[in-house]
């Protein structure tokens, strides 16, 4: 996917990873980036190529309306996400539902709404910001991990379905990033700009995944091992995150 001259839409583009991706797209020559956020007043206005768009990703009708309006979009970055740290015994149905409604279901809504637009514009790409927690379920992140696992599974299905129309689908796996979600976490974190660079490199390379950091690479490398071998080491790395999700 060529970024220079392209038009992208990034959800949650007013902070953290989303803001970094929007900035990186512009730095690499994107013609326009729609910053899709709940409150457009939170989007900087110093670059005319960055266009605020009001969007609640949990409202499928609003997603469809935005897709119908923005017929020039070629890249859709599904970045918006929330986390409600809890164990299987302390999690609430309401919080688990909220995580699914932000972390998973918007991927379904945006894929259905924007796939025709991307096809009409030459194929384009979807980028779904997932998590290392997509691959491993940890007790303190039980429902968050489940929502990200659902998003990962859907991403894989969408990749197969959309291949016929020439649409690239990139899944982004990353551990601890220096954002609001990890503000209270005392552990090594990577800057959002590092995630953004990895995402855009994957896009331009035609890749299906961006495995951003060492934690994610370690987890992926161990996925084929017996769970009795994988989980002790992974759980130790996640111990510091018992109060804060990775992304």
Identify the residue ranges that each predicted region occupies.
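Conserved glycine-rich cofactor-binding loop
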Residues: 7, 14-15
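C-terminal tail/cap regions
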Residues: 188-189, 193-247
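Active-site loop immediately N-terminal to the catalytic Tyr-X3-Lys motif
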Residues: 89, 138-142, 185
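Substrate-binding pocket helix/loop in short-chain dehydrogenase/reductase
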Residues: 87-97
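Active-site helix of classical SDR
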Residues: 14, 111, 147
